[in-house]
Amino acid sequence: MSKKLTFQEIILTLQQYWNDQGCMLMQAYDNEKGAGTMSPYTFLRAIGPEPWNAAYVEPSRRPADGRYGENPNRLYQHHQFQVVMKPSPSNIQELYLASLEKLGINPLEHDIRFVEDNWENPSTGSAGLGWEVWLDGMEITQFTYFQQVGGLATSPVTAEVTYGLERLASYIQEVDSVYDIEWAPGVKYGEIFLQPEYEHSKYSFEISDQDMLLENFEKFEKEASRALEEGLVHPAYDYVLKCSHTFNLLDARGAVSVTERAGYIARIRNLARVVAKTFVAERKKLGLPLLDEATRAILLAEDDE
């Protein structure tokens, strides 16, 4: 690699590349979440028959992974670059490898391996066939073909490509610590994110009010159910995300036992499944507007029979 791209140049390069492949460029969704997969731009759009091609950066919060800014690679919040394509292109792996070339990584000059790692997200009732992508011994991407989302079988299959931007940038810039990554010319990653990383870690592990979080979970769960009773999918899903993040804070604090943990995950999963079913039903009421006319007519006619 000749030119070492800054963090923001990596994002811009990936945005331009996937835009050229027909992906819409979405913006990060304004709710805490543990992964880009949980954005409605993936979770909701991966279900149902309508096509969907999108790419976006998603800041992802994982309270239990916080290390007070003392670990060079483990973070409370990291950034993912998420690509979802439905139906999955037959050449999605080739498209991915070409994206690495755009970043200055020639696949012929590096050890790039697709290591089987089937994916599952119990809290959203989602699963799929997957691979980790290893670049010279370091995982940089997760590849997934969704088989189930929100408890529903996916048809057509959605392909998801999730780049770990911090790992990718560490490799490209040849630094050992994420805090040494150059975010923009003359500005280091640590100068932006080290203090928030420390503060969020301290809050997650030491300061958070467990009683308040437990109460909030109950309130968010009830409000999600109330919104669903009114057929309001998107507000309901916002509260599912709030439930998920609140649970993650409780888990990081050690406030839930092993048995309770399974119970909380099941409660979130049950809500996510109702959201998924309601979303599909609402899209059908709208006439599946993203489908071509011929396919739409066939599917809607089948529902009428």
UniProtKB/Swiss-Prot annotation:
**Which CDD domains does the UniProt record give?**
GlyRS_alpha_core
Q: Give any Gene Ontology cellular component.
A: cytosol
Q: What is one process in the GO biological process aspect for this record?
A: glycyl-tRNA aminoacylation
Q: Name one Pfam family in it.
A: tRNA-synt_2e
**InterPro entries, alphabetically?**
aa-tRNA-synth_II/BPL/LPL, Gly-tRNA-synth_heterodimer, Gly-tRNA_ligase_asu
Localized where? Cytoplasm
In alphabetical order, the GO MF annotations are: ATP binding; catalytic activity, acting on a protein; glycine-tRNA ligase activity; transferase activity
User: Where mainly found?
Assistant: cytoplasm
Which E.C. number(s) belong to this protein?
6.1.1.14
| PROSITE patterns, alphabetized | AA_TRNA_LIGASE_II_GLYAB
Q: What is this protein called?
A: Glycine--tRNA ligase alpha subunit
Give the gene symbol.
glyQ
